[in-house]
Amino acid sequence: GLSAAQRQVIAATWKDIAGADNGAGVGKDCLIKFLSAHPQMAAVFGFSGASDPGVAALGAKVLAQIGVAVSHLGDEGKMVAQMKAVGVRHKGYGNKHIKAQYFEPLGASLLSAMEHRIGGKMNAAAKDAWAAAYADISGALISGLQS
């Protein structure tokens, strides 16, 4: 779980990360970074490449789910249940073959995209807090995916 200080940092930086577009731009940037570093992943998601129009749509969905997780920062059980349910839903997308090992490189791309948007506000404490939050979120997603 996250410490009180980590929850505070996440809540404070989320406002800037979400911005006016609820994080959609960060989500798109995250997936472009991820697909540029791992071009073979485009086919897994059914994309023609990083410039595929579906990238922006999926990026917006990813950040919307991060927003849901952030909204449950004070209730870890609820956050885990919600993210596990998202993982279970992804099991139903059988043609996509989403695997647990995709989450770590995706997390690196996400933190990079967040830092790109908020600059210096993504200091060492914020990076640590978001890395811990992403580990919790992705852990819950993976448990749903593998259930």
UniProtKB/Swiss-Prot annotation:
InterPro entries: Globin (IPR000971), Globin-like_OT (IPR050532), Globin-like_sf (IPR009050), Globin/Proto (IPR012292), Mb-like_M (IPR044399)
GO MF, one example: oxygen carrier activity
Alphabetized UniProt keyword annotations: Heme, Iron, Metal-binding, Oxygen transport, Transport
Residues holding heme b: H90
The Globin domain, residue ranges: 1-146
Disulfide bridge map: none
Superkingdom per UniProt: Eukaryota
Pfam families: Globin
Site (Causes a bend in the G helix): P105
PROSITE patterns named in the record: GLOBIN
Family, per entry: Belongs to the globin family.
Subunit structure: Monomer.
General remark: X-ray crystallographic analysis indicates that the D helix is absent, Leu-58 replaces the distal His (of myoglobin E7), His-90 binds covalently to the heme iron, the F helix has several more residues than in mammalian globins, and Pro-105 (G7) causes a bend in the G helix.
Name of protein: Globin, major monomeric component
Lineage of the organism: Eukaryota, Metazoa, Spiralia, Lophotrochozoa, Annelida
